[in-house]
Amino acid sequence: PGLIAGPKLSPRQEHDVELGWNAAKEIARLDIGQTIIIKNGTIVAVEALEGTNEAIKRGGTLAREGAVMVKVSKPNQDMRFDVPVIGIETIRIAAESGVRVIGVEAEKTLLLERDAVIALANDSNMSVLAR
């Protein structure tokens, strides 16, 4: 757990991660989706059938700049078949959409190409943290 890439979070971003975490856990429990996009305490996008990348794009359009993305696992998720994942494409789309922070669930989210994800997040001035 902790900061994986990018700058230290501001108090506002930390608050958005906390709110987004609670909301993401609830939508995951309801089997709606696993990702929330939030800015300044307001949820701007909820992942559903369209998937994470489309939720990021929609959230970025609505938030314009400085959004926070939170991705969690479902309760009792079968980690053999359905692991939450972020990778290069996630970071690229998030950066293009104005997301500045990505929070993921520690030990339950797979970072594909971890070193490349960290490098791209750092190059994009994007914080990535696990909790």
Task: Describe every region a protein language model picked out.
Residues 1-91:
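Conserved mixed alpha/beta catalytic, RNA-binding, or beta-rich assembly cores of soluble enzyme
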Residues 92-131:
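C-terminal binding/interaction regions
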